[in-house]
């Protein structure tokens, strides 16, 4: 319960003035933070193919069994994924890997024990989309835009650590990758690289899963420059 002070006019309380003037307190404008990201047309990029790149696990059950075995040895799995954005007609599109007709994923994967997140993502991006002619792709990892946790050896993941979970089984970090103005990507033959517009991803967990469908919200804080 708050108590109001006595009548200020009778007790010497300053009335609507700063008793220190501007000598010690400076009036500052609100701080505005704006991140600018350059986007280039999809037609600026060339897409080739290379040998198939297969998953480590043959089934979902095998994936969780391996995760369980590795958790006992090295602890929580660390995963990183890259968000690559282009534009078509000034509409942002996210590059996704498509396997089959209904499965979509961001490029990335598991980090090795003790591996740096940024360097690990660069390694994984090169393995998945890197050129075959020996020219090194310069991946510019710009910003971490999301964190997701898997509390158990099961499919559900959350953008927070659920209550009473002290040992998550996997931590996934999403990084925005700033693409160069032009580039060549080599896509494994068993995948298709598709450009999905943000309006298609938005609120579309049934089609793309909870993580990819959350990208429009995660990316809304950026100011896109359409080159």
Curated annotation (Swiss-Prot):
Listed PROSITE patterns: NUDIX
UniProt xrefs under InterPro entries: Cleav_polyA_spec_factor_su5, NUDIX_hydrolase-like_dom_sf, NUDIX_hydrolase_dom
Any single GO CC term annotated in Swiss-Prot or TrEMBL for this entry: mRNA cleavage factor complex
Motif segment (Nudix box): 109-130
Cross-referenced Gene3D superfamilies: Nucleoside Triphosphate Pyrophosphohydrolase
Record's keyword terms, sorted: Cytoplasm, Differentiation, mRNA processing, Nucleus, RNA-binding
Superkingdom of the source species: Eukaryota
GO MF terms held by the record: identical protein binding; mRNA 3'-UTR AU-rich region binding; mRNA binding
Any one biological process term the GO annotation gives: cell differentiation
Subcellular location: Nucleus; Cytoplasm
Site (Interaction with RNA): 55, 63
Pfam families linked to this entry: NUDIX_2
The Nudix hydrolase domain, residue ranges: 76-201
Matches recorded under CDD domains: NUDIX_Cfim25_Nudt21
Quaternary structure and partners: Homodimer (via N- and C-terminus); binds RNA as homodimer. Component of the cleavage factor Im (CFIm) complex.
PANTHER family on file: PRE-MRNA CLEAVAGE FACTOR IM, 25KD SUBUNIT
Entry's family note: Belongs to the Nudix hydrolase family. CPSF5 subfamily.
Record function comment: Component of the cleavage factor Im (CFIm) complex that functions as an activator of the pre-mRNA 3'-end cleavage and polyadenylation processing required for the maturation of pre-mRNA into functional mRNAs. CFIm contributes to the recruitment of multiprotein complexes on specific sequences on the pre-mRNA 3'-end, so called cleavage and polyadenylation signals (pA signals). Most pre-mRNAs contain multiple pA signals, resulting in alternative cleavage and polyadenylation (APA) producing mRNAs with variable 3'-end formation.
UniProt name for this protein: Cleavage and polyadenylation specificity factor subunit 5
Organism placement in taxonomy: Eukaryota, Metazoa, Chordata, Craniata, Vertebrata
Gene that encodes it: nudt21
């Amino acid at each position: 319960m708050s108590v109001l002070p006595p009548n200020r006019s009778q007790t010497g309380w300053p009335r609507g003035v700063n008793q220190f003037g501007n000598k010690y307190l400076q009036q500052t404008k609100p701080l505005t933070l704006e991140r600018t990201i350059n986007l280039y047309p999809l037609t600026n990029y060339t897409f080739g193919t290379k040998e198939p790149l297969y998953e480590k696990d043959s089934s979902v059950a095998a994936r969780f069994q391996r995760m369980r075995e590795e958790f006992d040895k090295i602890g929580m799995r660390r995963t990183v994924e890259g968000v690559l954005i282009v534009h078509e007609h000034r509409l942002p599109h996210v590059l996704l890997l498509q396997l089959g007709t209904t499965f979509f994923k961001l490029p990335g994967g598991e980090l090795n024990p003790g591996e740096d997140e940024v360097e690990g993502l660069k390694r994984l991006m090169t393995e998945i989309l890197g050129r075959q002619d020996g020219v090194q792709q310069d991946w510019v990892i710009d910003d971490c835009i999301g964190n997701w946790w898997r509390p158990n050896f099961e499919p559900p993941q959350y953008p927070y650590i659920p209550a009473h979970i002290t040992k998550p089984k996997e931590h996934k970090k999403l990084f925005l990758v700033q693409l160069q103005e032009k580039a060549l990507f080599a896509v494994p033959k068993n995948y298709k690289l598709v450009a999905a517009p943000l309006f298609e991803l938005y609120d579309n967990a049934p089609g793309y899963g909870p993580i990819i469908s959350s990208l429009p919200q995660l990316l809304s804080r950026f100011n896109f420059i359409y080159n």
